[in-house]
Curated annotation (Swiss-Prot):
Gene from which the chain derives: entS
Gene Ontology MF: a single term: enterobactin transmembrane transporter activity
Family: Belongs to the major facilitator superfamily. EntS (TC 2.A.1.38) family.
Gene3D superfamilies: MFS general substrate transporter like domains
NCBIfam families: PRK10489.1
PROSITE patterns: MFS
InterPro entries per the UniProt record, alphabetical: Enterobactin_exp_EntS, MFS_dom, MFS_trans_sf, TM_effector
Chain segments annotated as transmembrane: 22-42, 56-76, 84-104, 110-130, 157-177, 179-199, 219-239, 257-277, 288-307, 314-336, 357-377, 379-399
Segments in the Cytoplasmic topological domain: 1-21, 77-83, 131-156, 200-218, 278-287, 337-356, 400-416
Cellular component aspect of the GO annotation: plasma membrane
Membrane-side (Periplasmic) residue stretches: 43-55, 105-109, 178, 240-256, 308-313, 378
Known role: Component of an export pathway for enterobactin.
Official protein name in the record: Enterobactin exporter EntS
C-alpha cells in the first residue's frame, strides 16, 4: 500500500525493546509529574490566595530546568548517559518525598515548596537531556521522527490521566497523597530504565562547555529558519502557562476540586489527539506555513478560553489549543531535525527544549502578574489575544519559514 495513514505508526514499540522500556518509564513518570503539577499550584493558592505566588513557583522551577538542561547537555556528551538518566530520576524522587513530608506538617512551609521546586526542576531536566541525546542510539536516526511523535503521545496521554487522578486525590485525601504517589511512581520508573543498554557518549574533541554552547547560540541566531522555529516554540509555551490561572478561574466558575482536574487534562487530551492523528504531518509540502497557522489558531483558542461563560466550554477551548499546539510542536521537531547540521543536533535540541522551558517560565510570571492586577478572565484573554497579535506579525516577518517547501518523503509499507 502507498496511501499514507493519518494515524501514528507505533511499530517502534514492538521492534525496539530499549525504546519500549523508555516509553513505559516516561509514561509512569508523566503520570507522577501530573499529580505533582495539580498539587503544587492548588496548595500554594490555598496557602497564599495569590496567583502571583502560584506563578512564582512555576517561574522558579522553570529557571532551574533551564540551568539543568544546559548542564545536562554537557553531562550527556561527556558521561555514560544511562547513569545520568538513573541519577536524575532517583534524585527527583527524593525531592518529591520532601514535598510530601512538608505537606504533612501542621503548617507547611512555602519556602520549602519553592526550594524543592528548584531541586526537582534542575534534576528532572538532567534526565530529559540525557534521554534526548540517547534516543538516536535507541531507535536509529532514521526513526527519530516516528519516535518523537510516539513520545509526544506518551506525554500527552499521561498528562490526561494524571490531572484527573490528581483532582480526585485532592478532593479525598489532600496534597500529601499527590506528592507521595508522585515519589513512588518516580522510583518505579527506575525499573524499566535499568534494562537499557550502556549508552556511552560519542567520541569528540574536548571543548570548553561554554564555547560549545555559544556555537549553538550563534547558529540559532544566524539561521532565520531554525531561529524562527525556536521563537515560535517559545511563544507557544508562553501560551500554555495559562494553567497558573486555573485555580482562580475555577473559583470564578465555581468548580469543585474534582472538576479542576478537567482543566489540567484538557490541553494534554487535545495534544494526544493531535499526536495520534499525525501520520500525514511529515508529508506536508509547506510545513512552515502550517506551523505558523496552527500556532496562530492556538493563540486564538487561549484568548477565547477565559471568555467562556461555562467551565465546560473553557475545557473545549483548552482541548483545541492542545490539538493545534501539538501540530505546531511536531512540525517544529521534524524541521529542526532535518534543517540542523548533524554536528549541531544535540546543542540545538537542548537549546530548543530550554527555550520552551524559558517561555513557560516567562509566561507564568507574566500571567501571575496580570492576575494580581486584573481579573483571571481578563488575564487569560489578554495573554491569548496579545500573543495572537505577535503571531500575525511573525507570519509577515518570517518569510523564509512561511515559504519553506519540502519534497514529501517516500512512503513505505510500514507507513501505511
Amino acid at each position: 500500500m502507498n496511501k499514507q495513514s493519518w494515524l501514528l505508526n507505533l511499530s517502534l514499540l514492538k521492534t525496539h525493546p530499549a525504546f519500549r522500556a523508555v516509553f513505559l518509564a516516561r509514561f509512569i513518570s508523566i503520570v507522577s509529574l501530573g499529580l505533582l503539577g495539580v498539587a503544587v499550584p492548588v496548595q500554594i493558592q490555598m496557602m497564599t490566595h495569590s496567583t502571583w505566588q502560584v506563578g512564582l513557583s512555576v517561574t522558579l522551577t522553570g529557571g532551574a530546568m533551564f540551568v539543568g538542561l544546559m548542564v545536562g547537555g554537557v553531562l550527556a556528551d561527556r558521561y555514560e548517559r544511562k547513569k545520568v538518566i538513573l541519577l536524575a530520576r532517583g534524585t527527583c524522587g527524593i525531592g518529591f518525598i520532601g514535598l510530601c513530608l512538608n505537606a504533612l506538617l501542621p503548617e507547611p512551609s512555602l519556602l520549602a515548596i519553592y526550594l524543592l521546586g528548584l531541586w526537582d526542576g534542575f534534576f528532572a531536566s538532567l534526565g530529559v537531556t540525557a534521554l534526548l541525546a540517547a534516543t538516536p542510539a535507541l531507535v536509529g536516526r532514521e526513526n527519530l521522527m516516528q519516535a518523537g511523535a510516539i513520545t509526544m503521545l506518551t506525554v500527552r496521554l499521561g498528562s490526561v490521566i494524571s490531572p484527573m487522578i490528581g483532582g480526585l486525590l485532592l478532593a479525598t485525601g489532600g496534597v500529601a497523597w499527590n506528592y507521595g504517589l508522585a515519589a513512588a511512581g518516580t522510583f518505579i520508573t527506575l525499573l524499566p530504565l535499568l534494562s537499557l543498554p550502556a549508552l556511552p557518549p560519542p567520541p569528540q574533541p574536548r571543548e570548553h562547555p561554554l564555547k560549545s554552547l555559544l556555537a549553538g547560540f550563534r547558529f540559532l541566531l544566524a539561521s532565520p529558519l531554525v531561529g524562527g522555529i525556536a521563537l515560535l516554540g517559545g511563544l507557544l509555551t508562553m501560551a500554555s502557562a495559562v494553567r497558573v490561572l486555573y485555580p482562580a478561574l475555577a473559583d470564578n466558575w465555581q468548580m469543585s476540586a474534582a472538576q479542576i482536574g478537567f482543566l489540567y487534562a484538557a490541553i494534554p487530551l487535545g495534544a494526544a489527539i493531535g499526536a495520534l492523528t499525525s501520520g500525514k504531518l511529515a508529508h506536508s509540502a509547506r510545513p512552515g506555513l502550517l506551523m505558523l497557522l496552527s500556532t496562530l489558531g492556538s493563540f486564538l483558542a487561549i484568548g477565547l478560553f477565559g471568555l467562556m461563560p461555562m467551565w465546560i466550554l473553557g475545557v473545549v477551548c483548552l482541548a483545541l489549543f492542545g490539538w493545534l499546539s501539538a501540530v505546531s510542536s511536531l512540525l517544529q521537531y521534524t524541521m529542526l531535525q532535518t534543517q540542523t547540521p548533524e554536528a549541531m543536533l544535540g546543542r540545538i535540541n537542548g537549546l530548543w527544549t530550554a527555550q520552551n522551558v524559558t517561555g513557560d517560565a516567562i509566561g507564568a510570571a507574566l500571567l501571575g502578574g496580570l492576575g494580581a492586577m486584573m481579573t483571571p478572565v481578563a488575564s487569560a484573554s489578554a495573554s491569548g489575544f496579545g500573543l495572537l497579535i505577535i503571531g500575525v506579525l511573525l507570519l509577515l516577518v518570517l518569510v523564509e519559514l512561511r515559504r519553506f517547501r519540502q519534497t514529501p518523503p517516500q512512503m513505505t509499507a510500514s507507513d501505511s
